[in-house]
Amino acid sequence: MVEFKILEKRPDSIKFIVSGVDVPFANALRRTILSEVPTFAVDEVEFLENDSALFDEIIAHRLAMIPLTTPHERFSLDALELDDYTVTLSLEAEGPGMVYSGDLKSSDGDVKPANPNIPIVKLAEGQRLTFNAYARLGRGKDHAKWQPGFVYYKYLTKIHVSKDVPDWEELKELAERRGLPVEESDEEIVITTIKAFYLPRKFEEHMGKGIREEIVPGSFVFTVETNGELPVEEIVSIALKILMRKSDRFINELHKLAD
């Protein structure tokens, strides 16, 4: 049975344990988050005027990498086919001054820069910049500009430290300062590594003797961070729905071949 346990939730990140799965599933979830969850990003730019020090191509690349809020409630982001809806982000600016992402005017109030303080280009006195940028839904497998964030995972492990190890109290204090769960018995302490934990060099000689690391079978600690396009919990939810839909499609194709 697959189980999820949330360890930490912040506005831009979430950490959770998923249990009852194997490495292929864990990696499939990671890859789906990075490459399959759709977001809005600038895909084409029409320049009407550019007197700045940067070429059109450089500014277009900068615009493409600006995270745009993606209204997940309005689109079926877990669908295998994407909506071809296009949003226009326009700009008309004159120097002197810095042009920021917040200066972009969107044709859709729900699709706009997630951070208004991203620099685009600095204009000198008399320099002008005018363009229309067109944002569309896309997936990270086609270009990194459509990746919704970053995700990584690790095995959930337990570090058993015998009380025969000199200075074992130091390890206990270090783990507690890191916010790691520590269980203590008469013979040992057990540190659950819900986040990365590195033993000080002085304890390395005790590995395999008084200190041993145990991998908890079928359990992984995931950390997911959002760029701002989508709420971080929606990224995980959409990725799981996409995985299920792809699995259903694969099973249906197998049944067709069997028939």
Curated annotation (Swiss-Prot):
Q: Top-level EC class, please?
A: transferase
Q: Which family does it belong to?
A: Belongs to the archaeal Rpo3/eukaryotic RPB3 RNA polymerase subunit family.
Catalysed reaction equations from the record? RNA(n) + a ribonucleoside 5'-triphosphate = RNA(n+1) + diphosphate
The free-text function statement in the UniProt record for this protein reads:
DNA-dependent RNA polymerase (RNAP) catalyzes the transcription of DNA into RNA using the four ribonucleoside triphosphates as substrates.
Q: What Gene Ontology biological process does one annotation of this record name?
A: DNA-templated transcription
* EC id: 2.7.7.6
Identify the gene encoding this protein. rpo3
NCBIfam families listed in its UniProt record:
PRK00783.1 (NF001988)
Which Gene Ontology cellular component annotation is one that this UniProt entry carries? DNA-directed RNA polymerase complex
| Location(s), subcellular | Cytoplasm
**Source species of the chain:** Thermococcus kodakarensis (strain ATCC BAA-918 / JCM 12380 / KOD1) (Pyrococcus kodakaraensis (strain KOD1))
Protein's recorded name: DNA-directed RNA polymerase subunit Rpo3
Query: Keywords of this protein's UniProt record, alphabetized?
Result: Cytoplasm, DNA-directed RNA polymerase, Nucleotidyltransferase, Transcription, Transferase
Cite the record's note on assembly.
Part of the RNA polymerase complex.
Instruction: Return one GO MF term.
Output: DNA binding
Q: What is the lineage of its organism?
A: Archaea, Methanobacteriati, Methanobacteriota, Thermococci, Thermococcales
Q: Does the keyword Disulfide bond apply?
A: no
* PROSITE patterns the record matches: RNA_POL_D_30KD (PS00446)
